[in-house]
Amino acid sequence: MFIMIKKSELAKAIIVTGALVFSIPTLAEVTLSETTVSSIKSEATVSSTKKALPATPSDCIADSKITAVALSDTRDNGPFSIRTKRISRQSAKGFGGGTIHYPTNASGCGLLGAIAVVPGYVSYENSIKWWGPRLASWGFVVITINTNSIYDDPDSRAAQLNAALDNMIADDTVGSMIDPKRLGAIGWSMGGGGALKLATERSTVRAIMPLAPYHDKSYGEVKTPTLVIACEDDRIAETKKYANAFYKNAIGPKMKVEVNNGSHFCPSYRFNEILLSKPGIAWMQRYINNDTRFDKFLCANENYSKSPRISAYDYKDCP
């Protein structure tokens, strides 16, 4: 166990920097539309009475599509077309509503992996929403969510990630597309702490990505494959106390990428989407789908350790 700052201190630090949060378009949305959007039937939806079996990776995405340039393309130009379905706050069960992003032409993939993404303390869905279309365009069903309260702690965010995954599995549009045994979770700040906690509680979560994570527990027994995104100059959830400690104590497959000169908000800045998209997609493909073709985008031969944008890099199980 290592020394932690008190939650009240974290709250104070974030509130002080609140102007920065709301000055960047993708970090937060002050108001949340409560309009319920009608269900859109997916062209790739498999019969709910008889689900398809998972396909082999090569059946899903051709080798020629898997390139470093494609993985870093932030225009959502993965191998699949995507649609979205809005989940209103009123209809959501156990979380604050959100958006489901899903591929429409992935019938060759069989059942798909599903990923839930949660924002951090005093933040909204918009701060992490870019992960939705990026991952969906690579063959995942993804839900980006708002929390019940922007002040919810990490344990509450873990419960809401869990509820969001259940919501997708039961959804009448995308539920029959999902393999409930191939799940993932992504969270920023306290949401990252929530992803760590969820990984210790739900065995069907095969991969997580804590972004500048904070939790007042060490979580040293995380066996789930974990990609930690750290921010070098994080003064809210200091990297040495949190991200580095979580990474050091994890005992499963693990990788860390630290953004050079990054503040606590580095995972939400638009100009870091290209930097983080490639390892993020590759990690989820490798460990949710067991697609070893993505190994080459996780290792040092992709020059993570030499990039001026990255101040620290480590991959425990680099082949």
From Swiss-Prot:
Record-level GO BP terms: lipid catabolic process
SUPFAM superfamilies xref list: alpha/beta-Hydrolases
Alphabetical keyword list: Calcium, Hydrolase, Lipid degradation, Lipid metabolism, Metal-binding
EC number: 3.1.1.3
Catalysed reactions, semicolon-separated: a triacylglycerol + H2O = a diacylglycerol + a fatty acid + H(+)
Active site: S189 (nucleophile)
Dependence of activity on temperature: Active at temperatures close to 0 degree Celsius.
Record bears the keyword RNA-binding: no
Residues reported to bind Ca(2+): D314, D317
Enzyme's top EC category: hydrolase
InterPro entries found in the cross-reference section: AB_hydrolase_fold, FrsA_esterase, PET_hydrolase/cutinase-like
Annotated GO MF terms: metal ion binding; triacylglycerol lipase activity
Name of the protein this chain belongs to: Lipase 1
Native organism: Moraxella sp. (strain TA144)
Name of the coding gene: lip1
